[in-house]
Amino acid sequence: PFRYHYEIFKDSLTDESEDYDMITSELSYHYLDEYVKRLKKRAPYGFFTDWGWDSEYSCISFHFNYMNTNRNTIKYIDVYFKVTNDVGDLRKTGHFQGTGPLREFESASWEWDTSYYYVSGDASNMNITKVILTYMNGTKKVLTGNLLVFE
């Protein structure tokens, strides 16, 4: 009797791949959903995945990569900076503006090989002090302090 039962229901008894696929899919979705929730809690307006600067020939060059984690599409991203020397003397302040659009969970990069910002030879440190996000709907969000998130 068992052999007969096995022969008739053999396919359903041995074919477990669909169940494993479903379980794997549900687990993947669950972990992805949890990751996105943690990411949005830590960086609700986005974060820098990379940035850097140089002052070759006293002219500031700058680049950054930003990922938008907000549902609103970014139209402009203004990155404000200050440059100091090794003892903290202020050498230059300014900002660079990147143009979108940058949709939710998209990242983009901007690069300025040259700029109209010049610094003295002892300029050695740059800090991003503020970011202003202008969204497609015209609203703005100012990011300072712990809202400035770097990967």
Task: Show which residues each predicted segment covers.
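Low-complexity, acidic Ser/Thr/Pro/Gly-rich terminal tails and inter-domain linkers that flank the onset
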Residues: T24-S61, F150
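Short acidic, flexible loop segments centered on an aromatic residue
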Residues: R71-G88
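Short, solvent-exposed, Trp/other aromatic-anchored flexible loops in extracytoplasmic proteins
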Residues: L90-E151
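Amphipathic, non-membrane alpha-helical rod segments
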Residues: P1-I23
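A structural signal for short, hydrophobic beta-strand segments that form beta-sheets
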Residues: K10-L13, F48-D50, A123-K130
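Asparagine-centered strand-capping/turn motif at beta-strand->loop junctions
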Residues: N65-R71
